[in-house]
Amino acid sequence: MAERIFLEVNIDGLDPLISIRSLSVQQSIFAHHKFDLVVPSASIEPDNEKLFDIIAELVGKDITIDWETGTFKENSQGTDASSFKGIITDVSVYNERGNYMNVRIQGASPTILMDGVPNTNSFSELKLKPLYESVIASNLVNKLQAEDNLSYAEKIPFSIQYNETDFNYMCRIMHQCGEWFYYDGQTISLGVKTGKELKLTPDRTGSLHFGFNLSGPVAQVR
């Protein structure tokens, strides 16, 4: 039997959003995760005059998207539950077929906070975790705490961040040291952490969609 998906969205300052028209979460390994959520305007505020004041305050707020599968929610026991935490960056309102309004809420993973103005810095005699902490010092540190799952334990003698965003710099340095640097939907990981095995069976694959694409080469092949 195919399993149902139970979905709940929580935004700071609002009641949980249960009535969802559409939701997509795109999780990339080497880029910021993105989400796109559409809900009926009435699920946020039935009064249209108050609605615009409320949604104007949503940008910058934290959002948590929880979903789990099971034939019945009370029987799922959290055996296949996932959660995504992000930051709202865009909010818009549109009218659908002239009958009702929808609110579109878009955003990204907290790593987007590291992708601001390009910086130029130099670092010396630091291991990767202290280096990361130095890089994020000018950001909202509490939103960028990372788990240390590093294998590379050597100090980096000298490194230059030249006209790079903090995110691009850390991606480059971690790659040079043979380490992973990614967001798993809830926390930033320095290095690879051990996760639980997920088994895909024919009755579950209807709720999952995996895709791959091939992008162009970095340098032209002659």
Tell me the role of every PLM-derived stretch.
Residues 76-86:
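Short coil-to-beta-strand transition motifs
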Residues 82, 101, 156:
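Exposed loop/turn and edge beta-strand positions of beta-sandwich/beta-sheet ligand-binding modules
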